[in-house]
Regions:
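ATP-dependent carboxylate-amine ligase
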Residues: 2-6, 16, 27, 37-42, ...
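Predominantly soluble domains enriched in secretory-pathway, periplasmic, or organellar proteins
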Residues: 9
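Short acidic, glycine-rich loop/turn motifs
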Residues: 12, 33-37
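A short, compositionally biased
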Residues: 23-30
């Protein structure tokens, strides 16, 4: 279908039409980008997670293709603030929340956990919900997440849903978001940075 059409490449490889370089993610993503042979532009975003650099570079590629000025592209990326439970950082009276509860699959779950592990923050807590629509891969995918958690040094991990409950795990488990709410009311965390991630149907955004 794409034969004969113009292709625009983007990524962190030097040969890409739109090349990006990660600066840091502490906790917000900061990166540089340039068109092939052009000048570098630095962008400080309001997105959590170094994995979001590819999404940002895709937006850059679309903008440059349609002739948007490079400074305007960088400004738009800096000003964008997620409001859809995707890579949101929210500070409450008691804790700091990293909310990524719109969707979850094995790749995005691993990326979120790895990025959270790299964040230099105190008392890291995770509330992770089942990943839906995985079919026959459900059992293995959730066990892989649990094994990844076992290899990390997190202060506390809560697993939500029947798929996580069916794994070999040592973490605390909950049937659904309502059980988590009850636990949070009874033993409210204080001074924690909490990653909340799971499929949308797990309703973790309601916590």
């Amino acid at each position: 279908i794409a034969e004969g059409l113009e292709a625009v490449t983007y990524g962190q490889a030097e040969e890409a039409d739109i090349c990006g370089k990660l600066i840091d993610c502490a906790p917000y993503l900061r990166f540089q980008w340039r068109k092939r042979g052009g000048e570098w532009h630095e962008v400080s975003t309001q997105l959590i997670g170094s994995y979001n650099i590819d999404n940002a570079l895709c937006a850059v590629a679309v903008g440059t293709y349609f002739g948007v000025a490079e400074q305007e592209i960088s400004a738009a990326l800096s000003e964008y603030a997620p409001t859809n439970n995707r890579s949101q950082l929210t500070k409450t009276e008691h804790n700091t929340l990293v909310v990524d509860a719109y969707n979850a699959n094995p790749t995005s779950m691993r990326a979120a956990i790895d990025n959270f592990a790299l964040m230099d923050v105190p008392h890291k807590m995770l509330i992770l919900g089942d990943m839906k629509e995985l079919g026959e891969a459900t059992e293995a995918a959730h066990q892989e997440v649990v094994d990844l958690l076992d290899a990390r040094d997190f202060a506390e991990v809560w697993l939500v849903g029947p798929a996580f409950a069916a794994t070999r795990h040592t973490q605390r488990t909950f049937a659904d978001a309502e059980e988590v709410k009850a636990a949070l009311e009874a033993e409210r965390p204080e001074g924690c940075t909490i990653l909340i991630k799971g499929s949308n149907s797990m309703k973790l955004a309601s916590l």
